């Protein structure tokens, strides 16, 4: 059945509309997330960066001098300027050079009203001092733009999400009696990184046997415990690739464990019922309450001590969240990771997780929405 992807103006058009509404002539954003979001440039171990966007949407990217050539190749910016001098790690205050170079950009130097948002502490204030002008805080609009993903962002999230499932397969294959948790953890990282063909960002809970009741890091971190026959193995794997993130959780088994296998099946049913609640206008608070009720009624003596899920995109943990206090309504274009789990103290835990795209017609698992493969 064809999926109708959410349609909204591109994030640059939404940003330009905000600028017009407030009489802003240009906006300057600092930091890798902001830069990636607005001009598609992200680089492993990249230096401090910033982007200038004017009222017609022209984008000027500022990166370290030696990084300028690759930035011209990879970014969507109309112009790339390199700041500072040649070399790496020589200047201990590169932001000073970044700010100075931005202050010389024509639209910044000559503009009347500038908005700024910064992921680099203090860079916004330093720019204001350099240009001798008052700036408008653009943090709220940048946050709101990130909530709704454009189609190009969905594909970037999908790429990282698929890496998560390749890593999960490695966990499933490696969950054999005698294998150490850290060996399985490392196999997951290696599998995903080789598939990506570049360094990735990798976070993971990897717990086996009775350790699974400890839920997650930092309570239990993958170590030298040897997996035993019949052990459940819980893996929550989060991967960032090219600056966008995917998330997954699965409960694997070293052989057979009928009791926890049944628990996993029940959690998958709760995951599906939760998916059906991810509709425009719904809230994370409503979804969490129902998930918690289902977990506690299905598993007497079990608990759900963590959130029910969260959005993701440029980070692995974004608004909105499936928690009791989040009343932000869901909107088409939001991408949410949903992760029901249950934990029996001293015995075992289990968790499953998929990523969903909210559409006008409800939520669709991200791989299905974009025509990829199914679970696992």
Question: What is each of the regions a protein language model found here?
Answer:
Residues 1-376:
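Active-site neighborhoods and metal-handling regions in enzymes and metal-associated proteins
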């Amino acid at each position: 059945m064809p999926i109708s992807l959410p349609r909204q103006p591109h994030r640059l058009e939404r940003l330009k509309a905000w600028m017009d509404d407030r009489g802003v002539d240009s906006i300057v954003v600092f930091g890798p997330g902001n830069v990636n979001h607005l001009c598609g440039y992200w680089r492993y171990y990249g230096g401090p960066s910033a982007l200038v966007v004017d009222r017609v949407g022209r984008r000027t990217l500022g990166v370290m001098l030696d990084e300028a050539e690759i930035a011209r190749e990879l970014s969507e910016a109309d112009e790339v300027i390199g700041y500072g001098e040649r070399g790496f790690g020589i200047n201990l205050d590169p932001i000073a050079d970044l700010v100075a170079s931005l202050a010389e950009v024509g639209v910044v130097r000559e503009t009347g009203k500038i908005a700024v948002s910064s992921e680099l502490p203090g860079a916004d204030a330093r720019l204001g001092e350099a240009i001798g002008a008052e700036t408008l805080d653009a943090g709220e609009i940048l946050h709101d733009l990130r909530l709704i993903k454009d189609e190009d962002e969905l594909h970037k999230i999908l790429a990282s999400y698929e890496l998560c499932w390749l890593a999960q397969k490695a966990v499933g294959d490696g969950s054999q009696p005698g294998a150490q948790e850290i060996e399985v953890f490392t196999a997951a990282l290696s599998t995903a990184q080789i598939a990506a063909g570049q360094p990735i960002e990798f976070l993971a809970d990897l717990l086996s046997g009775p350790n699974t009741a400890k839920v997650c890091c930092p309570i239990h971190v993958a170590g030298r415990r040897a997996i035993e026959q019949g052990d459940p193995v819980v893996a929550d794997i989060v991967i960032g690739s090219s600056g966008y993130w995917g998330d997954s959780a699965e409960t694997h088994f070293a052989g057979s464990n009928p009791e926890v296998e049944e628990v996993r099946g029940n959690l998958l049913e709760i995951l599906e019922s939760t998916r059906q609640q991810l509709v425009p206008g719904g809230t994370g608070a409503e979804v969490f309450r129902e998930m918690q009720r289902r977990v506690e009624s299905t598993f007497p003596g079990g608990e759900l001590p963590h959130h029910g899920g969260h959005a993701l995109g440029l980070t692995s943990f974004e608004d909105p969240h499936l928690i009791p206090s989040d009343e932000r309504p869901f909107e088409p274009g939001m991408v949410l990771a949903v992760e029901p789990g249950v934990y029996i103290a001293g015995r075992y835990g289990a968790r499953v997780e998929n990523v969903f795209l909210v559409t006008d017609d409800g939520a669709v698992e991200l791989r299905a929405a974009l025509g990829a493969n199914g679970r696992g």
